[in-house]
Regions:
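Proteolytic maturation boundary segments
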Residues: 2-38, 224-292, 303-307, 369-373, ...
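Hydrophobic, small-residue-rich alpha-helical packing segments that form membrane-like cores
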Residues: 151, 167-177, 181-194, 199, ...
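M16 family metallopeptidases and their MPP-like homologs
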Residues: 39, 44-61, 67-69, 86-135, ...
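Metal-associated gating/positioning segment near the N- to mid-region
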Residues: 75-83, 87
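Active-site His/Glu-centered metal-binding helix of metallohydrolases
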Residues: 68-76, 302, 554
Length: 934
């Protein structure tokens, strides 16, 4: 029997379906209506993820309450019955959590979620967390003074979110979901409503909607479900059962156009335009079943194929996308591309043409097979990872099933079903689901960007109508295919000639007879998966001269040329079908690094592809020119907004140092193909190679794969040619305050603080600096967010730069309004000076050390940590292993307040502190639109 009330479902979805739920989950319901789900999942020892879901959101607001649901989410952290305002961050810190990272909350149209991540399963910690969640349910104080403080914080959050993409999305919703209440209920609210909300409105809204029958507790992790069940009852069954019935939700009524609908949102000075097409229809009411899940999967699969097709058939477009969303019983298929502003007519016709062609003709078998193979691979790998999966991932999937009102059959079971769906689907079934998804005659189109459209709606409709008179056809300029990689003999089979074991961390260090190094740890933390890092040469250390802008496209110039046997698209096909991720970068300044994650069986392919690239590395002129154009397009597309202002700050700090500062488009014009060749060809051909592998594979299998690939290359250098930077890192910007400007959103700004250190640092030193950055962040949070409310999310981070033993820095980033930015920059300098002169308390240091200690203990259960911190550079720099052993032996505990305060005095004094206010240049024309946004 259904427990639906109006538009609310107050029972589990599996109680209204023939689909069986995951039997491993303890499903419960208290007499007051509060539901809970507990899943024992000991895959990560001691880890527990817990969420309180409140099935209410911005859709419940009245016109006078806009933004209040989200505002209440904030107020939960600003004073409750058992936790005073300002105490919560310190409380979580002492428990090993950091506010903002492990404690998260967010509000949507129809629900609000509060989450806790426990790194240690301690009953006292769990009880404290439950007490906090219980306070959220009926113990938020809503003190007027705290409301006023948080009001400014929310205005700061609104300002930080309110960029080009957000405004364009809101405008498109008003076109696609015309008539639905959600178009006027954006969760963040409006400045006017946020400023008008009084205490009584908070109390009334919270009392009305935070009721136990709209609450669900979900916990997943290394727990005893029955014991946690008792704790849930202890803390939550005393919440009073509501005495009034739930009112019907006011979701509005979709206004369906008689034909194609369209609108535009004009934004000046951006150069480009985003074109979206959507088909919105009421969800078909059907009971959930295996077949309904298959249909939903096929619809999603078809849209993924559409996204792939957009990238292959519209050469002048970029960022092609397609997806499926559902709001309040309305399904929406959405597709989009980005084009130059002057190309909007060509772009909208092309987008419409691809959708209509697919509607009429369906997909090609080879496209379907290529995408099927990729998804099968990923589903199988995720399923193998399930036993060791982080509980937060599974917790989120249970919560999503509740908010979607679908049966949770089990994360792993769902992957098995997806595998069956993938094996069963065919061209006919995907084409049929695609046609059910799109109503071609009633589509809605939206354009956002720098477009000059008079009589916007009519002009767009006429453009579409004109395009629909032409025959529908497609031609590809890019190709994807299931291309079989065939390993070859690049040379004689390699042989291991040196080996060393490190029992403290179960590592094996080896060298092949061609001097290629191998570092290996066999780990079963991720069943069936391996992680690899291949470091080649000296990276920036091999760059003979400073060439600004070179780093922004040089690696692409190499990759875009392909190899002697394979074209780039063929290599891309291999990567997409056989690997979880693959990359080539200079994130480590002291090496060119190939990185990848894959199934154990695909290690041979990963190593083979890299060997292909290194066998006869060549930089072609055509690939260099393609990379230059890509860099120019990227800079043009990101030349508006704060990100460009931050690039300006980096250039200000490092004054033309191409390792850190960004080049300009003018810099690109003076970089020649020979500059790229002079930098890359020697290290890629002859340079030192250090391979680190961690994962679920045996040492013998790794050696066999290596011996036939990288171990078979011609002899490489025994040692690195350049083991140190050819010039020291210098901060050229003088200490003190500086204002920088960017072109973009006139209401947004950023403030950055920077404190460099130029001397040799031990491991203990670097940990102490990490602690210091944590205390700086807490001070910024207290003053700028909690006391003044002028910043939403101030951050501070220790930048280790491990490749530069005599350079590191602490950087703080603060979101701001343009008018407040100069004052906040001065506040950073004042806080810095105060810490340098007066020091930190023992409690502050202990609070910052707590999360580091707990997460460090957990880190050795992470293959990513083992690869990046333990193995990387293990033979090049043996002290890396010594540091790893020291961390395992709890070197963090040796960091004292005295050590941290010594660094505070050394780093944070006035002569070493830099602060910049990054503000928008004044100009007219941004965000011109005919639509008033909520």
């Amino acid at each position: 029997m259904s427990a639906a009330v109006g538009d609310w479902n107050l029972s589990w979805a599996h109680e209204r379906s023939r689909l069986p739920p995951d039997k491993r989950v303890l499903w419960g319901k208290m007499p007051n209506g509060l539901r809970y789900a507990i899943l024992e999942h000991p895959g990560v020892p001691d880890r527990v993820a817990m969420k309180l879901l409140v099935l209410t959101g911005s859709i419940e607001e009245t016109d006078e309450e806009l933004g209040i649901a989200h505002f209440i989410e904030h107020m939960a952290f600003n004073g409750t019955e058992h936790f005073k305002a300002g105490e919560l961050a310190s409380f979580f810190q002492l428990l090993g959590m950091e506010l903002g990272q492990d404690v998260n909350a967010f509000t949507t149209f129809d629900h609000t979620i509060y989450g806790l991540e426990f790194w240690e399963n301690d009953e006292a910690l769990i009880r404290k967390g439950l007490l906090f969640l219980r306070d959220i349910a009926d113990g938020i104080l809503f003190e007027a003074s705290e409301i006023d403080k948080e009001r400014n914080v929310i205005l700061s959050e609104l300002r930080s979110r309110d960029g080009l993409a957000y405004r364009a999305e809101v405008a498109s919703y008003q076109t696609f979901f015309k008539g639905l209440t959600l178009t006027k209920r954006m969760p963040i609210g409006t400045p006017q409503s946020i400023n008008s909300l009084k205490r009584n409105k908070f109390i009334n809204f919270h009392r009305k909607w935070y009721r136990p029958d709209l609450m669900v507790l979900v916990a997943v992790g290394d727990v005893d479900a029955l014991k946690l069940d008792v704790l849930f009852e202890e803390y939550f069954d005393t919440i009073k059962k509501p005495s009034t019935p739930l009112p019907k939700r006011n979701i509005g009524r979709l206004k369906t156009a008689r034909s194609v609908d369209a609108d535009a949102f004009r934004i000046s000075h951006v150069g480009s335009a985003t074109i979206r097409a959507a088909s919105v229809n009421p969800t078909r009411k059907r009971s959930e079943s295996f077949e309904s899940k298959r249909l939903a999967f096929n619809q999603k699969f078809g849209l993924e194929l559409l996204q792939q097709r957009l990238g292959e058939t519209i050469p002048f477009g970029s960022k092609g996308g397609a997806g499926f969303i559902n709001y309040f019983g309305h399904d929406a298929a959405v597709a989009s591309i980005e084009v130059g502003g002057k190309q909007w007519e060509e772009g909208i016709r092309a987008l419409d043409r691809v959708i209509r062609y697919t509607y009429n003709k369906g997909f090609e078998e080879k496209d379907l097979e290529f995408h099927r193979s990729r998804k099968l691979f990923r589903a199988q790998k995720l399923n193998s990872l399930y036993p060791k999966m982080d509980p937060s991932t599974i917790c989120e999937s249970i919560v999503k099933s509740i908010t979607d009102d679908t049966v949770f059959v089990g994360y792993d079971q769902n992957l098995l079903w997806e595998t069956k769906f993938l094996n069963d689907l065919n061209k006919k079934s995907i084409h049929r689901s695609f046609k059910e998804t799109w109503d071609i005659d009633h589509m809605a189109f939206h354009i956002a960007g720098e477009v000059n459209i008079e009589d916007g709606e009519d002009k767009i409709k006429k453009t579409i109508a004109k395009g629909r008179k032409d025959p529908v056809s497609l031609s590809k300029f890019q190709f994807q295919s299931d291309f079989e990689f065939e390993p070859t003999m690049w040379g004689k089979t390699g042989v291991v000639v040196d080996t060393k074991s490190v029992p403290e961390i179960d590592a094996h260090l080896m060298r092949f007879d061609n001097n290629v190094r191998l570092n290996f740890i066999e780990s079963h933390l991720e069943p069936g998966v391996v992680r690899v890092n291949v470091r080649i040469g000296g990276g920036f250390f091999d760059l003979k001269k400073n060439i600004p802008g070179l780093r922004e496209f040089a690696l692409q110039a190499f990759l875009y040329g392909g190899t002697n046997r394979y074209e780039p698209y063929q290599i891309s096909s291999i990567i997409n079908s056989a690997m979880i991720n693959f990359g080539f970068d200079l994130a480590d300044h002291d090496a060119f690094s190939f990185r990848g994650t894959m199934g154990s069986e695909a290690l041979e392919y990963f190593l083979g592809i890299i060997t292909e690239y290194l066998h006869k590395p060549t930089i072609y002129r055509f690939s260099y020119e393609s990379a230059i154009m890509g860099a120019v397009r990227y800079r043009m597309s990101s030349s508006i907004g704060i990100q460009d202002g931050y690039r300006e700050f980096q250039s200000y700090l490092f004054e033309g140092d191409g390792r850190f500062a960004w080049g300009t488009r003018n810099d690109y014009t003076v970089v020649s193909v020979n500059d790229v060749r002079d930098w890359l060809e020697d290290p890629l051909t002859h340079g030192y190679i250090d391979v680190s592998i961690v994962g679920d594979i045996t040492k013998e299998e790794v050696i066999e794969n290596m011996s036939q690939t990288l171990g078979a290359l011609k002899d490489r250098r025994l040692e690195k040619k350049n083991t140190a930077p050819n010039r020291e890192v210098k901060i050229m910007a003088p200490a003190g305050y500086r204002q920088l400007e960017f072109t973009g959103q006139e209401h947004q700004a950023m403030v950055v603080g920077y404190w460099p250190i130029n001397r040799y640092l031990t491991l203990q030193d670097r940990i102490a600096l990490q602690v210091l950055s944590g205390v700086i962040e807490r001070r910024l949070w207290e003053r700028l967010r909690e006391d003044l409310g002028v910043s939403y999310s101030p951050k501070a981070e220790f930048l280790s730069y491990r490749e530069y033993p005599e350079f590191a820095a602490i950087e703080a980033k603060i979101d701001s309004s343009p008018e407040h930015a100069p004052d906040l920059a001065q506040a950073i300098l004042e806080i810095s000076k105060d810490i340098a002169e007066n020091g930190l308390s023992d409690a502050e240091v202990a609070g910052a050390i707590g999360p580091i200690k707990i997460k460090t203990r957990q880190a050795f259960r992470s293959n990513e940590f083992l690869l990046d911190f333990v193995l990387k550079r293990a033979q090049e720099k043996p002290e890396t292993i010594e540091d790893a052993i020291a961390v395992k032996n709890d070197i963090v505990a040796t960091v004292t307040a005295e050590i941290v305060n010594a660094f505070a005095k050394e780093l944070l004094h006035t002569d070493n502190a830099r602060a910049a206010a990054i503000t928008p240049k004044p100009y007219i024309g941004l965000f011109q639109t005919d639509t008033d946004l909520p």
